[in-house]
Regions:
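A short glycine-rich, Lys/Arg-flanked "PGG" loop and its adjoining helix->strand segment in the class I
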Residues: 79, 160-175
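Conserved class I S-adenosyl-L-methionine
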Residues: 60-70
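A short acidic, Gly/Pro-enriched loop at the edge of an enzyme's catalytic core
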Residues: 62, 133-145
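Conserved beta-strand signature within the Rossmann-like core of class I S-adenosyl-L-methionine
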Residues: 91, 176-184
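Short glycine-dipeptide loop
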Residues: 61, 84-85, 173-179
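C-terminal lobe and adjacent flexible extensions of AdoMet/dcAdoMet transferase-like proteins
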Residues: 213, 250-271
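Class I SAM-dependent methyltransferase Rossmann-like catalytic core
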Residues: 27-59
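S-adenosyl-L-methionine
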Residues: 103-133
Length: 271
């Protein structure tokens, strides 16, 4: 019996289309799930979670590690999205940290996880780029994600901390796994070291650190770009919303700029 190749191609295409739609539907549901707070949803306009997670190829049956989830902005999306078929590691601040802000953030995050069954399967691990680097079992993760954290490691630990962070991500990922990095983008014509405490990082610098750890750059995206942001502000990135460190001073100006210009980079661990 002969099978028509055209019919087979149509069936295959239909199957792939259905699978894609199913993934999109699952993510859409995660974006409007009951655990998301109104204030966090309002920031979707700047953080573009759907487009960002799709760019990083995050799927509901994957093992995903999020680095320093903070108060849980992305946890509200990832925990329910991965709960049924996947696994979600939240690599938070270490319990033995001496930094009071980190202590409070970790406590509040743990309390948040107890507030809803959507978070019941979240696995908390610990991360500090120089002292706590076991974010997940080696070669176990399909995806590692870090949102607006790289500048902190560079500010507080220099290049050694930044490169160490990328090495820990590399260790946790399966061969072929994806690392997604988003951070505040410093223009390439500015001096990185002179503006170290601005909260901005050059995209070229982030790429260099990742390559030194063994990653391959697969793609970049303008999903989270903001051309209105010059990255030159009196209080660094915290001059802009949502921080607005200058209070009422020039508030309208900074609100008009919006949240920071951000690079979005997708790296892959070679197979």
């Amino acid at each position: 019996m002969k099978f028509n190749s055209t019919v087979y191609a149509v069936i295959l295409s239909a199957g792939l289309f259905t699978q894609f739609n199913s993934l999109a539907d699952n993510l859409d549901k995660a974006l409007i799930n009951e655990t998301r707070t109104t204030d966090n949803i309002k920031r979707d306009n700047y953080r573009h979670p759907k487009q960002t997670l799709e760019f990083f190829e995050v799927k509901p049956n994957q093992t995903v590690v999020e680095i320093w989830p903070g108060a849980g902005w992305y946890s509200e999306i990832l925990a329910p999205y991965l709960q049924a078929e996947g696994k979600y590691y939240a690599a938070h601040f270490p319990l033995d940290t001496k930094v009071s802000y980190f202590q409070k953030s970790r406590e509040q995050y743990q309390q948040r996880l107890k507030s809803n069954t959507a978070y019941s399967d979240v696995i908390i691990t610990e991360f500090n780029p120089l002292t706590h680097t076991d974010i997940a079992p080696a070669n176990s993760a399909d995806t590692v994600l870090t949102f607006r954290n790289l500048h902190n490691w560079y500010m507080n630990g220099g290049e050694d901390a930044a490169i160490s962070a990328f090495k820990s991500f590399y260790k946790a990922l399966k061969p072929g796994g994806i690392l997604g990095v988003v951070d505040h983008q410093m223009p390439e014509n500015l001096d990185q070291n002179a503006n170290k405490n601005s909260g901005y990082v050059k995209m070229s610098q982030a790429i260099s650190w990742a390559l030194q750890a063994g990653f391959e750059l697969e793609a970049s995206s303008e999903i989270n770009a903001n051309p209105k942001d010059s990255a030159e502000h009196p209080k660094g990135v915290w001059t802009l919303p949502p921080s607005l460190r200058l209070g009422e001073e020039n508030k309208h100006k900074y609100l008009a700029i919006g949240e920071s210009d951000r690079f979005t980079l997708k790296f892959r661990k070679p197979k």
